[in-house]
Amino acid sequence: VIPIEKLRLTKVIYSHAHCPDGLASAMILKDAFRMLGMEPRIEFLTHGTKEHAQAGISGDGVTLFCDIAPTPDVAQLTRATGTIIVLDHHKGAEALVRSFGDLSVFADEKLDPGVSGATLAWREVWEPVNRETGTHDFLMGAVPINVKEFAYCVGARDTWQTKDPRFQRGQWISKMLMSKPAAHWLGGTRRVELENGAVHDVPERAVLPYLHESEVEMGRALFEAHEEAVRQAVEQVVAYALIGAGVDVYLYVFQEQASGFRLCSDVAEALRQQTDGRTNAAVVAGFAYVVHEPGDSPQLVYSLRGLNGFDVAAFAKANGGGGHTAAAGFEVDPHRELIGRTPYDDIRSRLAAFLKGLNP
């Protein structure tokens, strides 16, 4: 359990950028710290950027990372200072997260299926803070249930628990979250006077469910439109068969959307259904050119999904990225690493080299 007294020293919260789970984590944490009468600065990080490389170095109070971990260099500099809290569930970050000892919680995807950044934010911060302060119980007894359900719906979707009854609702919530800028969900307060006369400024969405039912329904409509984009992406998939570790491994490559809601998970699910009964391991790779900051050169980002047990986290890690067994990714600088070849050629070559390493 992260000590409440350590949470009270938190100055900055870092969460995963361009990700509904990262946004939901930030919403839950903002709410939790408001219960403590605090408002730490919230920033969103993208893996591999200069902002990520510098996050956590400042030494101003405690820094909380959720749904993303500090870089190994920052971890080495700060591990002994007791100024970093890390909550994460990405497989490739396990050793780094656990190295922070009692100020870290790692959710193992096999032991804790469905536990994501949002779930960790609720379980390790929101729920203990609410128990300590009683603020939400006092305001509205049903709210803690709503927060937990919100977190677990997002978690089911983020970790792709397709058999979880909350998965579909998590799809709708995630789609709605990503349809608006983070400031929409994190801004806005409401002054509430309690029965004992105390006055609290709380986030507008802390008093009611984080998403109103009408917003979830909007997310459902957006998701249904999104499914048409998935259908079109599946039609554009280029398939390859590679030999690795003594078996055929299929590679399915398509061009991702550069912004907005990513298609890779849903394309992978559609391909899984199309190839139902096929036992060969497979990798689904969506690629997009992404500009992280205005003025930066575009980077080539690969989103990976594994089918039939293929460990895409290991493949991503071999290329400087990370993630989960079934969902991972990495990025490359196309100006240095893609000279003379297309993303289709590049990802095929990288997977072939990875498979050769498994079965030299």
Predicted feature residues:
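Hydrophobic, aromatic-enriched interface-forming segments
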Residues: 155-241
